[in-house]
């Protein structure tokens, strides 16, 4: 479930720190969160799609590690990001 280019550019523009920023932790976490939301909707409609479920778990693990890195290095940006994405602070 890939993101279309328009949605991806919109997310990058919203969470980027400057105009050329496409790979910061915030952008990566926001993109992963959107892909996780899309896969979650797909799995609600297709509960027997086990390969997508495994992909979802992999994405959640990637997001978790990026969030822990951001929390450890720059807590202010972490707190702002989880507020915007409506994620739980763990």
From Swiss-Prot:
Highest taxon of the lineage: Bacteria
Keyword rRNA-binding among UniProt keywords: yes
Pfam family, one: Ribosomal_S15
CDD domains hit by this protein: Ribosomal_S15p_S13e (cd00353)
UniProt keyword annotations, A-Z: Ribonucleoprotein, Ribosomal protein, RNA-binding, rRNA-binding
Entry GO terms, CC: cytosolic small ribosomal subunit
GO molecular function, one term: structural constituent of ribosome
GO biological process, one term: translation
Entry-linked InterPro entries: Ribosomal_uS15, Ribosomal_uS15_bac-type, uS15_NS1_RNA-bd_sf
Family affiliation: Belongs to the universal ribosomal protein uS15 family.
Role: One of the primary rRNA binding proteins, it binds directly to 16S rRNA where it helps nucleate assembly of the platform of the 30S subunit by binding and bridging several RNA helices of the 16S rRNA. Forms an intersubunit bridge (bridge B4) with the 23S rRNA of the 50S subunit in the ribosome.
Self-association and partners: Part of the 30S ribosomal subunit. Forms a bridge to the 50S subunit in the 70S ribosome, contacting the 23S rRNA.
Protein name according to UniProt: Small ribosomal subunit protein uS15
Organism of provenance: Helicobacter hepaticus (strain ATCC 51449 / 3B1)
């Amino acid at each position: 479930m890939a993101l279309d280019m328009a949605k991806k550019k919109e997310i990058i523009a919203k969470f980027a720190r400057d105009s050329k920023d496409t790979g910061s932790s915030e952008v990566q976490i926001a993109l992963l969160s959107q892909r996780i939301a899309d896969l979650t909707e797909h799995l609600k409609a297709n509960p027997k799609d086990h390969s997508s479920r495994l992909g979802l778990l992999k994405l959640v693990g990637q997001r978790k590690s990026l969030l822990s890195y951001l929390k450890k290095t720059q807590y202010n940006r972490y707190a702002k990001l989880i507020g915007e994405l409506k994620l739980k602070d763990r």
